Amino acid sequence: MKDRTFKAIIGSDNPLETARVLLAPYNMQTLNTKVNACTLCSSKNSKEMSYGNPNANILIITDYATDIQEYKDLFKDLLNRSNIVQSDIFITPSVRCICKRSDNEYRLPSYTELKNCKQYTDFTIDFVKPDVIISMGATALNQFIPDNVNFLENVEKDTYYKGIFTLITYSVRDIFNFRKLNEPTDDKIDHIINILNKAQKYVNNKE
């Protein structure tokens, strides 16, 4: 699989795509600078930045931001257990603020926080322009599907957003929540890995 940057600069006859590729690293820096300085939400919590290859074929929109190391470790483990090419992914949280109550306990993001962060999600999609999006968890899904849609009814479905093939799966936070309820999680973990593999296969088949 050739790198998109190489293909756009060396083998592309589309000047707009070449310009997008060349500007992508700058746009990633712009995104994180804007997020870090963002004061749209009254909470003004600490934030989680987007990272990865800004010219990736695969964009992963994760659940709302976290600073819990166990979550980060499981996410990395799932990537390692899949066939996904990790140099070809860009990862962005659906809500960048780490949402905590006044007592420092974690909470769900508010509708306003979700709405305020949507502009950053859309900006990310536009500058990465991936071949496929992986949406992990209900918060990510609500960035581009109305929030009255039931997540569990959509988790097995494929869709399109801005004309981009989009796969829906569970989030790492979902796995930990199911464990707290003493519910089995092997099938959910398998689903995430299968979705990662499906995204990579989709990219490979486009080559």
Regions found by a protein language model. Give the residues of each.
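A polyanion-binding, active-site-adjacent surface
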Residues: 2-207
